[in-house]
Structures are given as structure tokens and as C-alpha cells.
Amino acid sequence: TLISDISSKAIGQSISIVAHSMGGLVVRDTMRLHWDNWNQFISRKDSRVILLGTPWMGSHLIMQVFTGHLSRVRQLNLLDTHHTKEELIRVFNAYPGLYDLLPVPKGSDSFETPEFWEQINSELNSDKIQIPPLLDYFKKYKNEIQSFKPNLDNLYYLAGKDDLTTCAYRIRKTIFGKKLQYLGTPEGDGSVTWSLGIPKNLPAERIYFAHNTEHGNLANDEKLFEGIRDLLT
């Protein structure tokens, strides 16, 4: 693995990782799939891992991709004159990495079951929401993440802040019929809620908040650089 290669070359040196968003899931999978290499790395003197807005246990925003409600999906649909929105969603649904971003905590929605998606269509009296084809893959992945007990030694989390972050959904009655509505919480960075992003059991003294920086700018906001540098030293 890359981390073992770097570790073998950086003899006697500390190694630190700053991972933004999904990069933190690469860190988590390195922990999970290369446990021995990870423990050798993180036990090095002064080694650190800083996660910037990582969706550690997923993001509710991803359901909006599958249902076609995410603003980026709608924008792509406007720009792409050769494919319908349904065709675009069918392309997105084929990428396993997208499923890796769905919420996975115990007690979360049963995204891994066809019945979950069928129920939404039933309540909307519609068939527009596609049943994602890789649900078996996601079910296996979800079970693996739920059973994984990570080593959080020397790991820090920097959470951003935005006005609202998608945290749930509901079926709402309107004069035009029933509509799928997404709900937001102020406790999030615009893409990832704090409750899903911040790893459970991470000590409070290793959790930091950037109250004026949203998700996409956590690695770009120069006002944060000095604080990140301090955590690395």
C-alpha cells in the first residue's frame, strides 16, 4: 500500500495526513483493510490525521443524487442535451463509490433494500425514482462499516458550517399532489451533518469547528491554515 511504502522510506520521521471529504473515507478504508500497516503508521511519534468534513458515516445529501433532486444533477441535466435526467441517474447508479457515501449508522434508513425505494414511489404514486442496482453491494458495505472499530489515535476532525445541511426527508402533501421534500439542519457544513461526519468516540478535545467555512472550502480557506498547521506539529 502507499502508506506502507511511505512508512518504509520515511525512517524516523513523522507522517501526517490531511484528508478532505471523501479522502477521509480512503483513510478509513486504509484503517479497515490494511490494519497492520495503519497501526504502524499511526503509532509513529508525532504522526497525525486531520479529517476535513469527511462523511465518516455517510451523507444524507447522496440520497438526492439517487432521486435526482440534487442541484448538481439538475444542472447537469440542463447542460446535457443528449440525455434525460433518468438516463443520467442510471449512469450515477452504476458507480459503487456513490453507494459508499450513503448513511450507514445502525438505525439509519434501509437504503440497501428495494422496498425502501419502492415505498417512496408508492407514497408519491409514481415510478420515477429508480431502484439502485447495487443494493447488495451496499448492504455488504454497510454491515462491514457498522462492525468496524476504528483506531482513532492521533486523529482530529475539523467540521465546517453552513446554513442548512440535508439531514432527512419526508413526503409532503401539496396542492399539486405529494412531493418528496428534503429537510435540513444547521448542524452541518452544507454537505455532511456533524452527527454523521464526526466519528463516534472521538474525544471532544480533538474536534474543531470552522463556523464560517462550508464543506467545499475546508481545504481552501486560508484562515484555517495556521490552525491546521498547529495540529500537525
Residue ranges and their predicted role:
Residues 1-13:
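Active-site catalytic motif of lipid deacylating hydrolases and related acyltransferases
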Residues 11-15, 153-154:
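Short coil/turn segments at beta-strand junctions that form active-site/ligand-binding loops
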Residues 15-16, 210:
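Glycine- and acidic
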Residues 19-23:
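Gly/Ala-rich beta-loop-alpha elbow adjacent to hydrolase catalytic centers
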Residues 24-25, 156:
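Hydrophobic beta-strand residues of extracellular immunoglobulin-like
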Residues 26-30:
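Hydrolases whose catalytic domains are alpha/beta-hydrolase-1, hotdog thioesterase
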Residues 32-233:
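Helical cap/lid subdomain of alpha/beta-hydrolase-fold lipid enzymes
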